[in-house]
Amino acid sequence: MKVIPFKIPQTGKDAIHVQIDKAPHFYNHLHQHQEIQLTLIIKSEGTIIAGDHVGRFTEGDVYIIGSNQPHVFRNDASYFRQKKQAESITVFFDENTLGKPFWQSPEIKSFQYFFRNSNGGFKITGRKKEALKTKLVQMADADGFDKLLLFVEIIKLLSNKKDLKPLSKITIQRSIKTFDGNRLNNILEFIFKESHRTIKLNEIASVANLTPEAFCKYFKTRTRKTYIHFLNEIRINNACQLLMNEDIPVTTVCYRVGFNNLSNFNKVFKKITGKTPKEYKQIG
C-alpha cells in the first residue's frame, strides 16, 4: 500500500473540476494533490486524517483539504464488509483555476485570506456549511455559465473566516516523496485494522521495520503525535460510531474498540471529545 501523489484528472472541457463519487467506500490510501479540495459528504461515515488532524466524518459534513495536505477519508470497517454506498461531491481548484489574473483581481481581494490560510484545511460549520451544501449539490448538476456562477458564489462564501474551523496545525506541507509515505501508510493501515486489540510497541515497530525506539521517534516526527495518542484517537472515533449507532453498554464499547480498562477509556474519551461516553450517547 503506497501513498499516492494524486494528479486530479481533467476532462479537458471544463475549467472547474467537479467530481461525484459513488462507491462501496471512499479511496482509502493516504494521498495528497496540488489542488485545494472542497468536499461534501452525501452518504458515508468514518475517520478523516488530514495533516495532524484525526476526527470523525459523517453525512452532511463539508471539508476543505489544503493544497498538498496528506489526507484520507477512511470509511468504517462495515463499508469494507457489507454492501454499503459512500457518496460525495468534490470541487477541486487552485490559483490556476480560471487563470491567475482572476484571483489577483481587486474584486476578490478578500479571498486571499482563504488562500493564505487553507493549507491546514477546515471543517465548515454553521450557516456557511448549509449554504455550501446547497451550492455543491446544485453544482453537481450544472454546466457552462451556471457552473461558473455557482463557483463564484462558493468563493464568496469562503472569503471570510466565519464558520471555518481549522483542522490541522501543520500548515507547511512537505512533498509526498519526503513524507516517507509507503512506510507511514503501512503503519496506518495496520492500526486501522488492529486497533480493536492490544498492539505491543515492538509489533507495530516491526511493521515499519524499525526498532521500538526508532519507531516512536519516526511516528512523532511524521504525525506530530505520539503513537499511543494517535491509537487512542482511532479507538475513540470507533467508540463514537458504536455509541451513535448501536444500543450497547459503554462497558461493551470500551472493550470492543481496544481499551482494557473502563476508567482509562472514560478519561481518554472525555479528553478527546470533551464529553463522557454516556453524555455522547445521550446526544446521539
Language model segments and positions:
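C-terminal structured domain segments across diverse proteins
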Residues: 268-272, 280-284
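Generic protein-terminus/edge-of-domain signal
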Residues: 1-63, 69-72, 76, 264
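A hydrophobic/aromatic-rich effector-binding and dimerization subdomain
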Residues: 2-10, 69-134
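Short, Lys/Arg-enriched, Trp-marked, Pro/Gly-tolerant hinge/linker segments that flank
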Residues: 122-128, 140-197, 203, 207-208, ...
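Regular secondary-structure segments
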Residues: 42, 112, 133-140, 188, ...
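Terminal helix-turn-helix DNA-binding modules in bacterial transcription factors
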Residues: 189, 193, 198-211, 217-263, ...
